[in-house]
Amino acid sequence: MLYPSIDNLLLKIDSKYSLVTVAAKRARYMQLENDKGVLPSYQSDKFVGKALEEIHAGKLVLKNDDK
């Protein structure tokens, strides 16, 4: 079983495509900047997994710049 589940993540970000984009950008930032993350501990060892955990925890959100 994957954690967090895609269904739970889609409650935070409404589109699978947006979810992938946000997670990928955060994972890339964590990798390039050697960022340890905003959560005290992670279940995943990989950057994308950590980004998804941050989204699930509500620490990482998608900002909509529609005007």
Curated annotation (Swiss-Prot):
Q: Does the keyword Transcription apply?
A: yes
Enzyme Commission designation: 2.7.7.6
Q: Which Pfam families match?
A: RNA_pol_Rpb6
Query: What keywords sit in the KW lines?
Result: DNA-directed RNA polymerase, Nucleotidyltransferase, Transcription, Transferase
GO molecular function per UniProt: DNA binding; DNA-directed RNA polymerase activity
Major enzyme class = transferase
The domain of life is: Bacteria
User: What are the annotated disulfide bridges?
Assistant: none
Q: Catalyzes what?
A: RNA(n) + a ribonucleoside 5'-triphosphate = RNA(n+1) + diphosphate
Q: Name one GO cellular component term.
A: DNA-directed RNA polymerase complex
GO terms of biological process kind: DNA-templated transcription
The record's function comment reads:
Promotes RNA polymerase assembly. Latches the N- and C-terminal regions of the beta' subunit thereby facilitating its interaction with the beta and alpha subunits.
Question: Hey, which family's this protein in?
Answer: Belongs to the RNA polymerase subunit omega family.
The protein's assembly and partners = The RNAP catalytic core consists of 2 alpha, 1 beta, 1 beta' and 1 omega subunit. When a sigma factor is associated with the core the holoenzyme is formed, which can initiate transcription.
NCBIfam families (UniProt xref): rpoZ
Provide the protein name: DNA-directed RNA polymerase subunit omega
